Amino acid sequence: MSYKLTLLGTGSSGGVPRLGNNWGACDPANPKNRRRRCSALVERISGRGRTLMLIDTPPDIRNQLLDAGVETIDGVVYTHDHADHTHGIDDLRRLAFNMKRRVDVYMDEPTRISLETRFSYCFRMAPHSTYPAVLNSLAIDAPQPLTINGAGGPITAIPIPQMHGDAGSLGFRIGDVAYCPDVGGLAPESVELLRGLDVWIVDALRYISHPAHFSVGQALKWIETLKPKRAILTHLHIDLDYAALQRELPPHVVPAFDGLQITWA
């Protein structure tokens, strides 16, 4: 039995390049600078098959799942309701049709209210519509663990409450790997949930400060505090060139890029 996490997207809300072919400080010749919006795929692999857990459905999710060869999914978890993490939700329809059943999606209460309002037809068949609802809404009660079952065996994730500007968001810990995009602060209780990590994938939006996201400097300070064995910086804006950022980081910290994979037992 083993686990694999694939970073399907590692960019900030506008991606890299931004519309208008704006690469900022990023070198267009380096494919690791082309970043779709943030999402991750967690797989548990055993002799019986695979269990797949998707984290977020950004606007790029269709191409991300095509690139990853994903045809079915056992469950989707949401970090929060912002557009760059949710507005590909309708593409779950195709997965539901492939599986001939609804897709289970896990959300905290603010995200549930938001998505069931904005995308109500995904959860409830609209009057006079011929399109069936395709999603089951399941509650996240952080920090209570949630479990997604599939052919490869159960994936258990601990939701970690995060500060994200005026709103909140969730990170997720699976074993000794944690995925924490869109974080601007951590309460003491959440800090305790992030100790003893082998790998921490963490938000590092820009060099300069931002009210809702860690900067590179803030992320490095938190890495120094929590002491994961390795760390990966994600949710990267156009001012963070991959090669330039890599040169500045300590040996156990690397920038993320779309398609990066980590495995563990």
Feature names for model-found ranges:
Residues 1-180, 184, 189, 246-265:
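Binuclear metal-dependent hydrolase catalytic cores
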Residues 143, 187-265:
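Binuclear metal-ion centers of metallo-dependent hydrolases, dominated by the metallo-beta-lactamase
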